[in-house]
Amino acid sequence: MYIAVPAEILCLILPLLLGVAFLVLAERKVMAFVQRRKGPDVVGSFGLLQPLADGLKLILKEPISPSSANFFLFRMAPVATFMLSLVAWAVVPFDYGMVLSDLNIGLLYLFAISSLGVYGIIIAGWSSNSKYAFLGALRSAAQMVSYEVSIGLILITVLICVGSCNLSEIVMAQKQIWFGIPLFPVLVMFFISCLAETNRAPFDLPEAEAELVAGYNVEYSSMGFALFFLGEYANMILMSGLCTLLFLGGWLPILDLPISKKIPCSIWFSIKVLLFLFLYIWVRAAFPRYRYDQLMGLGRKVFLPLSLARVVPVSGVSVTFRWLP
């Protein structure tokens, strides 16, 4: 187990925050390309300084609290959401040994942290004392709980193949073949469940602008709004990293060639994460928002039985051919 020091934590958090900032810019650029627009291109060359301008604007805005809100909880909710999105990265390996804390229960740790994220949203909706914010928070809670069950069953499928909750061991078990190839339907279900877990389009019902104005963060401004925003995009990167570790071999090269081995393993990991982030943005640009009943029906009537049914054949094949680790 590696003991984290402040310098290592700083080297993890700063690139993550920069990645979140430029992920917002990349999303706006890709959305503009799909809609045949230019996107932001005024602030800096090709709009590269747009995230800095947006951040300064949010910092300089006045933080306004509703008169009927619970002030302490109203202020703490975005901080809790943002902090949970950061502490989850403690167990994510970027290369073999390049991890803050190589826990044997790293996968369970990530699952638990992602489950706790809903509390910040619930507290934000309740403490705002606004009907629209509270309805958005209730939607988010129901949505995340519904899809966490299928995510848990998918994780069990991977655990049967590996026999360990250590993320580094899960990656090293994919040296011969990535789990995304034999378990491709599971990968698709897991990615769609991650879309719902992070409240991203087409499952962004908790913040439906047409119905709930902006959802649980309708009363937030200034840094409160910015922290929710940063937390959402940090969770996007986290879930993309988890998809990479579980199904695309993590930091392992795409092809076992001499030239591919010269590229640092952390670069391979970043390339695969960027692939999933592009899918996040492309799905938002291509698909309309689901109705609430369609969203819950997909999670409970389709993904839950399918993910449960997938555990049975994987277990049977592993026991029959003595492939259990």
Swiss-Prot record:
<keyword id="KW-0813">Transport</keyword>
<feature type="transmembrane region" description="Helical">
    <location>
        <begin position="263"/>
        <end position="283"/>
    </location>
</feature>
<feature type="transmembrane region" description="Helical">
    <location>
        <begin position="177"/>
        <end position="197"/>
    </location>
</feature>
<keyword id="KW-0812">Transmembrane</keyword>
<keyword id="KW-1133">Transmembrane helix</keyword>
<keyword id="KW-0520">NAD</keyword>
<dbReference type="Pfam" id="PF00146">
    <property type="entry name" value="NADHdh"/>
</dbReference>
<keyword id="KW-0472">Membrane</keyword>
<dbReference type="GO" id="GO:0008137">
    <property type="term" value="F:NADH dehydrogenase (ubiquinone) activity"/>
</dbReference>
<feature type="transmembrane region" description="Helical">
    <location>
        <begin position="105"/>
        <end position="125"/>
    </location>
</feature>
<dbReference type="InterPro" id="IPR001694">
    <property type="entry name" value="NADH_UbQ_OxRdtase_su1/FPO"/>
</dbReference>
<feature type="transmembrane region" description="Helical">
    <location>
        <begin position="5"/>
        <end position="25"/>
    </location>
</feature>
<feature type="transmembrane region" description="Helical">
    <location>
        <begin position="40"/>
        <end position="60"/>
    </location>
</feature>
<feature type="transmembrane region" description="Helical">
    <location>
        <begin position="237"/>
        <end position="257"/>
    </location>
</feature>
<keyword id="KW-0830">Ubiquinone</keyword>
<keyword id="KW-0496">Mitochondrion</keyword>
<keyword id="KW-0999">Mitochondrion inner membrane</keyword>
<feature type="transmembrane region" description="Helical">
    <location>
        <begin position="151"/>
        <end position="171"/>
    </location>
</feature>
<feature type="transmembrane region" description="Helical">
    <location>
        <begin position="79"/>
        <end position="99"/>
    </location>
</feature>
<keyword id="KW-0249">Electron transport</keyword>
<dbReference type="InterPro" id="IPR018086">
    <property type="entry name" value="NADH_UbQ_OxRdtase_su1_CS"/>
</dbReference>
<protein>
    <recommendedName>
        <fullName>NADH-ubiquinone oxidoreductase chain 1</fullName>
        <ecNumber>7.1.1.2</ecNumber>
    </recommendedName>
</protein>
<keyword id="KW-1278">Translocase</keyword>
<keyword id="KW-0679">Respiratory chain</keyword>
<comment type="similarity">
    <text>Belongs to the complex I subunit 1 family.</text>
</comment>
<comment type="function">
    <text>Core subunit of the mitochondrial membrane respiratory chain NADH dehydrogenase (Complex I) that is believed to belong to the minimal assembly required for catalysis. Complex I functions in the transfer of electrons from NADH to the respiratory chain. The immediate electron acceptor for the enzyme is believed to be ubiquinone.</text>
</comment>
<dbReference type="GO" id="GO:0005743">
    <property type="term" value="C:mitochondrial inner membrane"/>
</dbReference>
